[in-house]
């Protein structure tokens, strides 16, 4: 049995035309029956580093009994010159968070993933105590289990 949090993380590869640019981490989030990929905004666009991909590719698992079965899934970042992703904001302005919607009908029929939902979010008055254990899941610098395409998990 695979821990659900491992299936909520997505390995992201950015491209500009056929050229591979960078690796990144993201996670799936569902709200009102819609599926999103959440990542850092600089993954989609970063002027200071001149990072301007036109698409991303994520790895999707296809078989719960054989996690080595997976496929790449390409997601365009722009249509007719307009961004398909949205920049995160807070009271001070733009933050380094972005989301892009994933069209469920475009996913392979047997896609296996888990997604966070609004019930996983802390409320405005919830507090995390100093010293609370933290689990970090992702694909640092693209590093991952190359057989099963699973993320790295570390406790802090």
List the predicted regions and their residue ranges.
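Histidine-centered active-site/metal-ligand motif
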Residues: 42
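Serine endopeptidase catalytic core focused on the charge-relay Asp
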Residues: 17, 22-23, 30-32, 52-156
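Protease-domain processing segments flanking chymotrypsin-fold serine proteases, especially trypsin-like
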Residues: 1-25, 30
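Cytochrome P450 catalytic-core helices
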Residues: 39
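Compact nucleic-acid interaction/catalytic patches
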Residues: 45-50
């Amino acid at each position: 049995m695979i821990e659900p949090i491992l299936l909520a993380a997505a390995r992201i590869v950015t491209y500009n035309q056929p050229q591979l640019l960078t690796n990144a981490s993201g996670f799936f989030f569902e709200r009102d029956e819609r599926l999103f990929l959440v990542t850092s905004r600089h993954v989609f666009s970063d002027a200071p580093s001149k990072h301007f991909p036109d698409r991303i590719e994520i790895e999707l698992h296809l078989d719960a009994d054989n996690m080595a079965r997976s496929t790449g899934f390409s997601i365009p970042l722009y249509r007719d010159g307009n961004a398909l992703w949205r920049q995160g904001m807070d009271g001070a302005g733009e933050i380094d968070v972005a989301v892009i919607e994933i069209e469920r009908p475009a996913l392979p029929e047997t896609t296996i993933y888990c997604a966070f939902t609004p019930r996983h979010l802390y409320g405005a008055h919830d507090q995390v105590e100093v010293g609370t254990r933290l689990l970090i899941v992702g694909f640092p610098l693209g590093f991952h289990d190359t057989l099963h395409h699973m993320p790295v998990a570390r406790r802090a």
